[in-house]
Amino acid sequence: MAKRVAEKELTDRNWDEEDEVEEMGTFSVASEEVMKNRAVKKAKRRNIGFESDSGGAFKGFKGLVVPSGGGGFSGFGGGSGGKPLEGLTNGNSTDSATPFSSAKTAAEPKAAFGSFAVNGPTTLVDKKISSPKCNSSNQPPSSGPASSTSCTGNTYHKQLAGLNCSVRDWIVKHVNTNPLCDLTPIFKDYERYLATIEKQLENGGSSSSERQTDRATAAMEPPSLFGSTKLQQDSPFSFHGNKAEDTSEKLEFTAEKKSDAAQGATSASFNFGKKIESSVLGSLSSGSLTGFSFSPGNSSLFGKDAAQSKAASSPFSAKASESQAGGSSSECRDGEEEESDEPPKVVVTEVKEEDAFYSKKCKLFYKKDNEFKEKGVGTLHLKPTATQKTQLLVRADTNLGNILLNVLIPPNMPCTRTGKNNVLIVCVPNPPLDEKQPTLPVTMLIRVKTSEDADELHKILLQKKDV
């Protein structure tokens, strides 16, 4: 649909006139019969072809495929059909059928976990492992009632299952975030945590069934964050940047502190930083932060104050970011206020004619080929001369004040009143319009704003012509 053309031409003569008030129409609702005949187009979803599972660049990659028999660690006895890890030893024993290993051999750390699934089950904590065998080099003597031995075995199994689930979740999260991360330090931590659990089993820690339920619940919560403070040059992630602290302090795996010490050894939970972000790991500075970061409100897994570790491990300042954001927004608001929708106004300095006795704004036309063509817009001045004649001068309304017409009014100059607000004269133009015929008289038309101005100008020209 084309735009509506202007009904009235806007010029310098009618720019200050008020427009006629137009009545605004109303929209009418089409009837049902009209709507039935109209074609209504509806958007259709484009069929985007997805790449099949059998093709693609990663068709041969089967490392993260969930096995049909269930997820989790394949060598940790998750189900009845699970097979133990082959070739693993617990230090002193050579039995390959033992489902758990302390991974004392650090030459092949990646074989300690086997293959794992991305979406493995998280209910491994609640499963009870039927075998009461403990993975320790020195088996504790079975001196006591059978119920105490069974309770101790269940506690050990739940703690070990919680440790394995935490290791699995941590590896899956960080490998998905960055497949090139270095996983070597986590195996050393796993050995230390496993040795701590075996030490608790040797001490004969026991608890009631209610404490077992609380412990299983606490194992699913993230009480600590396994963070990093030093970014190595050859790997994206590092877990032991401060070696001096590792040698000076023995990191002991402690339980959640309660009122009595008997309950404290059974509420341990293993978590390798479920909530830590990869961007935080990548941006930590070296030497100023602690080796681990912990969540507030819970005691640290390594015997440190959680509040202090949280304050020391926060690499960013919330107040600083808020102040910077507020400053940038205020600067944007100030910039918007300074900018205005109005275009810059062009200031025109009019050239004054001090000795003129008559001045009037006009538009000058000249006749060529039986039609009038515009010469320009300016100010008409009538000035007396030394020869008792009157000078007619028209200067353009520009900063330069170019001369559009500069002639003397001779006695025989034709001067007539024509139209509504026009005065017609015939003269030899100066400056000349045609360089080839500079002395040829040309009909000039002077248009003023109102008819009264035209009458006044015509009267003055007739008076000065007769002088």
Swiss-Prot record:
GO terms for cellular component: nuclear envelope; nuclear membrane; nuclear pore. Residues 89-103, 132-151, 226-236 have a biased composition (Polar residues). Gene3D superfamilies: Pleckstrin-homology domain (PH domain)/Phosphotyrosine-binding domain (PTB) (2.30.29.30). PROSITE patterns: RANBD1 (PS50196). There is a cross-link at residue 352 (Glycyl lysine isopeptide (Lys-Gly) (interchain with G-Cter in SUMO2)). Residues 313-330 have a biased composition (Low complexity). SMART domains: RanBD. Transmembrane segments: none annotated. Residues 1-14 have a biased composition (Basic and acidic residues). Its main location: nucleus. The keyword Protein transport applies. It comes from the Eukaryota. The modification N6-acetyllysine is found at residues 8, 83, 127, 449. The modification Phosphoserine is found at residues 52, 209, 235, 269, 295. The modification Phosphothreonine is found at residue 247. InterPro entries: NUP2/50/61 (IPR015007), PH-like_dom_sf (IPR011993), Ran_bind_dom (IPR000156), RanBP1-like (IPR045255). Residues 76-303 are annotated as: 5 X 2 AA repeats of F-G. Highly expressed in testis, intermediate levels in kidney, liver, spleen and low basal levels in somatic cells. Expression in testis undergoes changes and subcellular localization during germ cell differentiation. The keyword Manganese does not apply. One of its GO terms (biological process) is neural tube formation. Residues 144-206 are annotated as: Binding to CDKN1B. Does not interact with TPR. Interacts with Importin alpha-2, Importin beta, Importin beta-2, NUP153, Ran binding protein 7, CDKN1B and itself. Contains FG repeats. FG repeats are interaction sites for karyopherins (importins, exportins) and form probably an affinity gradient, guiding the transport proteins unidirectionally with their cargo through the NPC. FG repeat regions are highly flexible and lack ordered secondary structure. The overall conservation of FG repeats regarding exact sequence, spacing, and repeat unit length is limited. This is Nuclear pore complex protein Nup50. The gene is Nup50.
